[in-house]
């Protein structure tokens, strides 16, 4: 009888093991999603340094009629397909439509103008106003853009000696 039981136990074990070999796989799936939001950014700015402003003309012995120019660069990018990207430039010392550098006295101001591009031949930039900027597009790549600045003789002559400075804040915007 023990022998029959051993054979029966072996048969049951074999049957159980063979059942595993006949198992059926079960599957499930999951979805994967992502989205890209419309967005624009600016950064990586360089300083605009006019340096010493030429006040006197040694050749004529009078006041200089020369303008002073300087440039600054910044990076800007928008996600591909963002609608109507624009930039706004605001002077910390400006008022109305002007960009202004403030002197050490706290009351002396030198007005300057900003332009799109590397020279004052570009489109002038309105103070604190959103506007399109040449070369700035929503194509998903970073653009290195240049702004030119100009101080004309009338805005610097007669100003007291000292250091003048301003901070320009660039705001990137778009139509959602």
PLM region spans:
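Gram-negative bacterial Sec-dependent N-terminal signal peptides
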Residues: 1-22
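N-terminal small/polar-rich segments of proteins
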Residues: 22-104, 135-176
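Predominantly extracellular/luminal cell-surface or secreted proteins
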Residues: 90-92, 113-117
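Charged, amphipathic alpha-helical segments and their flanking helix caps
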Residues: 109-110
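Extracellular beta-sheet repeat scaffolds used for adhesion and glycan interaction
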Residues: 118-142
